[in-house]
Structure formats: C-alpha cells, structure tokens
From Swiss-Prot:
UniProt cross-references to PROSITE patterns, sorted A to Z: DEAD_ATP_HELICASE (PS00039), HELICASE_ATP_BIND_1 (PS51192), HELICASE_CTER (PS51194), Q_MOTIF (PS51195)
Tagged with keyword Ligase: no
Basic and acidic residues: bias regions: 16-30, 529-544, 666-689, 767-781
Name of the protein in question: ATP-dependent RNA helicase DBP4
Domain of life according to the entry: Eukaryota
Gene Ontology CC terms: nucleolus; small-subunit processome
Species annotation: Pyricularia oryzae (strain 70-15 / ATCC MYA-4617 / FGSC 8958)
Length: 798
C-alpha cells in the first residue's frame, strides 16, 4: 500500500529556463546572420530616403525612431551605407547637414555586429575639437543608442582626471577631445586601445586649426592599423588631406555639396552692413534693441571682447537675456550657458569661435558677426549655427569700409551669396556716453575695455601681416593702417587708445592656446619683493592684522592693480628716453678724450656679428661653444678648384646658360655616353681585381693541399729551410691590398717583428722544433692493460 503523506515540493523548472536562453541565443544569431547578409546585398547605387530603408539592427532602428529621426539627409544617405560595409570615409558636407548621425549609426552597428561586450574594452573612439561639440555628440549617442547594452563615456578637459581614469577600463565607446584622450593613453593604467574597431574624427579641419595636429598624430600611432576610420568636416584643407592620407586606407570621398551653387544652406539669408569701426558697438546695440523677440548668437574675435561687451551691455539692460561664452571659462560654467541658451526662446549669446563648429542650438534666428572672420571657412561655420536641418535662418556681418572689397571677393570665390543692407537712422543710437560713464564708475569694466581693445588690435595686426604675405592686394581683407583705432577706443568709453606692444603672430597664437598658469597662493611684501613673506607658525594675528591683509576679492582687482603699476612705470620711464647708444670709442671722442684713461668694452667679430664684452657674464659667453654657435651664422659647404678658388658645393644654373650648351636631348645623350665610358673603365678594373683574387685563392688552396700531403702540419715553401730563414719571409714580401711598400721600409725602426715573442713557459731554443703530433704504428690491436700502458709510455716519451 502506498504511503499517503505530504506531496514533495516541485523542483524549479531549470531545464525550461535553459531552453528559453538557448532559443533566445539562437534567435539572436539568426538575426545577426540575416543582418550581415542584408548589408552585403545592399546596393550602394541606390539612394535611400528614410532610415527604415537601411539594413539596421533592431536596437538602432528603434532608437532612431524614438528620437524622431525619419528622413535621411544627403550626407547620411551616402555615408551610412558605405560605413556599414566597412569602408573608410572622408566626408564633406555643409554645416547643419546631419553629419553626427552619419557616423554614430555606423558606430553602433559596427559594435553590434561584432557582439561587443564590456570585457572586450574600448571598441569605438570619437574625437571632437571642442568640449561643447563632444558633449552634444555624447547626448545624441545616448538618445539613439538607448536600447543597446554598450557602455559609453565622455572625456573632456575641465573634469577630474582621476575619476575619468577609474571608469575608462569599462568603456566600449569613448567621446572626447584629442588632448585629454592622449593624456589618458600616456598616463592611465589599464586604458587599452588594442582592440579598437572604429575611429571617428569630427570637424577634422578645426582639430588641425586648434593646434591638435601633434596630439592626433601621436594618438593615431597608439591605435591598431586594422581599424575603420571615418573623417568628417564641413570644409577641406591641406592639413585635413594630409591627415586623411596618413590615417585612412583606400577612403571613399563623400562630398554631397561639391557641385552645389552655394556653400551655405539655401534657406539661409545672408546680409552685410558697412559700418566704420568706431560705430560697430552702436550698430550692435541698435540691432539687439530691434530684435528683442529673437534668439541670436553674436560672434567676436577674442574672449576679452566678449567679456567687455557682455559686462557693459548687461549694465545697460537692453531688455533681452544676455549670456556669454569663451574658452577661458570653467567647464561647468560653459555647460550651464549652453543649456540655458538652448532652452531659451529669446536670448542673446556673445561668444568666440569656441561654438562655431558643430554646436546645434535650437531655434537660432540670427547669427551676428561683429568682427570679420580670419577666413571664409570660419564664416561658413559661424553662419551654420542657424538654418540647420532645412530650417530658415538669417545672418549679418559688420564690415569696415576697408574690409568690404576683400571680404566680398573671398565670399564670391567660395560661392557664398550675400546682399548689402543699411541700418535705419531711427534704429541708430550712440552709446558712447553710457559706456564712458560705466568705465568711469567701474574700474573693472575700464580694464576690460583696455584689454579688449588691445586684443582686437593685435588680432587685426596679425591678420594684416598674414594677408600681405599670402594674398594679393585686391584680395586683402584686413588693413591695419586704415582702421580708426583712436575712434574705436573712444567708442568703448576710453579716453584714448592704450599703448600696444605687438609680438610675432606665432608667439601670440602659442600664448593664446597655452593652458592657464595656476594662481599663486603667496602674498607679496609691501616692499615689492617677489618672494612671499613667511609668517611664523605660532604668531598671533589680531583683527587689525587681518584687516590690513585683506584685499579686494574681485577677480579683476589684481589685474587692474598690475595695469595701474605698469602705467605708472611707463610714465616714469617716459621722463628720460633713449635717443642714441654710443660705443666706447665714440664716447671718448664725444667727451674730448676725457675718458681715455677709463677701461673700454672689448668687441669681437664673429663672422659679421659683433660681440661686445662689457661684463664678466659676456666674457664667460666666449667659453661656451653652444652659446657662440647661436651668434655665428650658418656655415656653407665649399669646394676648391685646381686654382684654389672656393665655390659653393651646390650651384644652380639659370635657363639662359643651360640653353647655350645645346639642346636638352643632345646633352642627355652626351651624359649617357660619358657615364657609359666610366662604367666600362670601372668594369675592366673590376675584372682584373676579381681575376687576381681568384689566382691568390687558387695558390693558397694548392699550398694547403701540398702541406697536408707532406704531413708536416703546414705547407713548406720552395727554397725554404727551417734552420736558415723564416718560411714566412716570402709571404711578408708580397704586396698587401690597399698598402704600398717602399725600399726603405725594411730598415725602418717601426717595422713589426718577424716572430712573435715567446712566453715564459715556451722553449728558448730555435733549433729544436717540436712536431705538432706523434704517430705510433701498432702491429696488433691492444687487448690487455699492459698493452695500453706501453702505448701511453710511448706517447709520453719525447
């Protein structure tokens, strides 16, 4: 009878779970093989119009659809199919044409088809020229890749390097700026890029312009050569072509607007206003007051100008929210400004070219360029902040009368349509008195005005030198001498134009791109010494001490104090000015010989450069070869003819002298014949030398064979006797290759000894020569121990 009790607990359906996982894995493999087959069969000649027509995976297609991207732009329709097939791409398209999706979609598909996991580490790398563009690209990636399981990271400057380093080893996709990524490659342990599948360079021309060329070159050397590379830019330059040649393999050049009639979107209306430099700020104020219900971006040439215009206009309250952005701001402040301006309906953003590339702001109505850009590519990228994705937009640029002709000629060459407009008199208003009042009340704004004026003047001066060097007079935009700088300074509220010290363009550019030095924490003495005053550890500080040590907490106070000190020093130095520098002998003549008894400075001529030894430090300079080499000119290679006359090693012949020698074909034949004769003469000598070497080799071989046949351990030469002369004497008398023997060499004292000196353990007798080996003949094979002992005794016996 069966036992009746409680039923046993049911076992968990583990087999069912395993079966479900197996089916899911199998279904995924089938979908992956179907996707790969669809990509291979996709016709590149077709022109898809929507994302649904592309062979995309389900997570990517769903992410694109949820982000409300449906229609393909021209660059997306041509670049995405090529990238899906694994081709390297060099893409060029107008700004605002959707290049970001053109490389993000293939990036996700590449990792999805490779079944990339977190253990495989970094699989895709995206380089952006600016932090703002990197942040925007990362946000788009999060939207369209929300249904994937990849881990993505953002690496830009202004954030903690240690926090970034801790998360880098877990990233599959990385977006950042070249400098910070190269820093992690050199310093971060565990950051591995050996398995990288895809490299993307966004706005490559801007990456080159910002001085990242060395960083990118060093970065590419770290990456594997089997990667796929996508390079996108709105404009192409020589640096971009060089980068493409080094980093791309058989690239596909995709240029959707190469044959377009205009280089800018057709929905963009472009205008220019001719206004003198002293009236630019008045025109800008009137333009802002006339468009209070608009969203605009105002570009200026430097960060100091941005700060001055923002601070002064903010105090004048135009009636629209004002924001400003430049490269010297902290990263969190830049992100906050970007977010606030993007979410605003009506706002005015003063900015430098830091946001001129790739940044997509929502609903920008106007792009205003107060200062002319350095080239037309910068103009195209600036106006690209509006009229994006087939939307309408407007742009205006303020030009000085001296800049009008050159800028219009450049824009016409780049196929940029632009029309001239004039500002209404009713909209014009002079704000010179208001700015002067603000500068009088606020020393900080006055300091900003001075620095803004200096930075603008230096930028125009540098651009003028570059235009004069590379462009024709008709194509020159910037003309420093024709600008009314005195009137411009007064229009900014200053009493006059500040003094400017111009430097070389490369030095200014290097200083501008250099990182900021850390702020000094020490305080200077009242006496003006640079060394910080040390305070004792146990010294008691009273309230009075703290009050006297307190300084203005305003960020501009220290800079303004330095500016005031510099101005006071300039005024003191202006009392005595240097008119002429007299040498020692000229000073004696001027003094009528009164100083003849005093010591004068010595002068040394260093190949055309005179070195005055007027101090001990200058005298020590003579002992340093490295320092003297800097003062001397570069050497020239000279050759001397038969008469002893020196000539340069390399001389160029002009065209007339070359034609006098005869036709080129006859000279070529003559040269070929002369070289042929030289080859024949050299061939005769080579054959004779080879024949002699062959004969010597044959004689040596025969002598060695004869010596082995005689069994005396070495060859015996004819006529030689061991007791009379050295058997090697005849060999020493033979001529050696590359040496000559004279009759007097035998009697010279430097002649090498014929025989090697004997060691202490060798016999001094020359008459007795020991044989090298001794042979004992045996009648029978030894069998017993006595036989072996007898053989050993015979060998030991001399």
């Amino acid at each position: 009878m069966a036992h009746k009790g409680k039923a046993a607990p049911a076992k968990p359906p583990t087999s069912h779970k395993k079966e479900v996982k197996s089916l899911k894995r199998k279904r995924g493999q089938e979908e992956l093989s179907t996707l790969r087959k669809a990509i291979d069969e996709f016709d590149l000649k077709s022109t898809p119009k929507a994302f649904a027509e592309l062979p995309l995976s389900e997570p990517t297609a769903k992410g694109v659809r949820d982000s409300h991207f449906e229609t393909l732009t021209d660059i997306q329709a041509r670049a995405i199919p090529l990238a899906l097939k694994g081709r390297d791409i060099l893409g060029a398209a107008k700004t605002g044409s959707g290049k970001t999706l053109a490389f993000l979609v293939p990036l996700l598909e590449k990792l999805y088809r490779e079944q990339w996991t977190q253990e495989a580490k970094l699989g895709a790398l995206v380089l952006s020229p600016t932090r703002e563009l990197a942040v925007q690209t990362f946000q788009v990636l999060r939207k369209i890749g929300r249904h994937h399981l990849f881990s993505a990271g953002l690496v830009i400057g202004g954030k903690s390097v240690r926090e970034e380093a801790e998360a880098l080893s877990r990233m599959n996709i990385l977006i950042g700026t070249p400098g910070r990524i190269l820093q992690h490659l050199d310093q971060t342990h565990g950051f591995d890029v050996d398995n990288l599948q895809l490299l993307v360079l966004d706005e490559a021309d801007r990456i080159m312009d910002l001085g990242f060329q060395r960083d990118v070159d060093a970065l590419v050397q770290h990456l594997p050569t089997t990667r796929q590379t996508l390079l996108f830019s709105a404009t192409q330059s020589k640096k971009v072509s060089d980068l493409a040649r080094l980093s791309l393999k058989d690239p596909e050049y995709v240029s959707v607007h190469a044959e377009a009639t205009t280089a800018t979107p057709s929905t963009l209306q472009q205008h220019y206003i001719v206004t003198p430099l002293p009236e630019k700020l008045d025109t800008l104020w009137g333009f802002i007051k006339a468009n209070l219900k608009s969203k605009m971006v105002v570009f200026l040439s430097s960060g100091k100008q941005v700060r001055f215009v923002y601070e002064s206009f903010r105090q004048m309250q135009p009636g629209i929210p004002l924001l400003h952005m430049h490269g010297r701001q902290k990263q969190l402040a830049r992100l906050d400004v970007t977010k606030r301006f993007d979410s605003s309906k009506h706002a005015c953003l003063f900015a430098t070219d830091v946001i001129a590339r790739g940044i997509d702001f929502t609903g920008v109505d106007w792009v205003v360029q107060v200062d002319a850009p350095e080239d037309t590519d910068d103009y195209i990228h600036r106006v690209g902040r509006t009229a994006r994705y087939e939307r309408e937009g407007k742009a205006v640029i303020f030009l000085d009368p001296s800049e009008e002709a050159g800028m219009l000629k450049r824009l016409e060459r780049k196929k940029v349509p632009i029309t001239k407009v004039t500002a209404k008199d009713s909209k014009k208003k002079s704000i010179r008195d208001e700015l002067q009042s603000i500068c009088w009340k606020s020393h900080d704004v006055k300091y900003l005005a001075q620095k803004a004026f200096i930075s603008y003047a230096r930028a125009v001066h540098r651009a003028t030198e570059r235009d004069e060097k590379h462009n024709e007079n008709s194509d020159q935009v910037f003309k420093f001498d024709k600008l009314d700088l005195e009137g411009f300074a007064k229009s900014m509220g200053l009493a006059g134009a500040p003094q400017i010290k111009f430097q070389k363009g490369e030095d200014v550019k290097r200083m501008k791109n250099a990182p900021r030095a850390p702020l000094s924490s020490g305080s200077e003495d009242e006496s003006g010494d640079d060394k910080p005053r040390r305070r004792k550890k146990d010294e008691v500080r009273t309230k009075a001490d703290k009050m006297f040590e307190r300084t203005n907490q305003d960020v501009l106070s220290k800079h303004y104090r330095n500016l005031v000190e510099d101005g006071e020093n300039d005024e003191e130095e202006d009392f005595f000015t240097t008119k002429r520098v007299l040498r020692g002998d000229e000073l004696d003549e001027a003094a009528g010989g009164a100083g003849a008894g005093l010591p004068t400075a010595k002068t040394i001529d260093l190949g055309g450069t005179e070195l005055v030894l007027d101090s001990k430090r200058r005298e020590k300079l003579i002992k340093s070869k490295k320092q003297l080499a800097k003062l001397k000119g570069k050497g020239q290679k000279l050759v001397f003819d038969d008469d002893g006359v020196a000539h340069p090693l390399y001389t160029l012949q002009d065209e007339d002298d070359f034609k006098q020698q005869g036709p080129a074909e006859a000279l070529r034949k003559q040269f070929v014949e002369q070289e042929g004769d030289k080859v024949k003469e050299a061939d005769i000598d080579d054959k004779a030398l080879a024949k002699q070497k062959k004969r010597e080799k044959k004689l040596k071989r025969k002598a060695r064979e004869r010596g082995e046949a005689e069994g005396n351990g070495g060859p015996q030469l004819a006529g030689g006797d061991d007791d009379d002369e050295d058997p090697l004497e005849m060999l020493r008398s033979l001529p050696m290759a590359g040496t000559t023997r004279d009759s007097g060499d035998d009697e010279s004292e430097d002649e090498r000894p014929k025989k090697k000196p004997k060691k202490w353990f060798q016999d001094d007798s020359d008459d007795e020569r020991k044989p090298k080996s001794k042979v004992i003949e045996l009648d029978h094979e030894p069998d017993t121990l006595e036989d072996y002992e007898a053989i050993a005794a015979g060998l030991l016996d001399d």
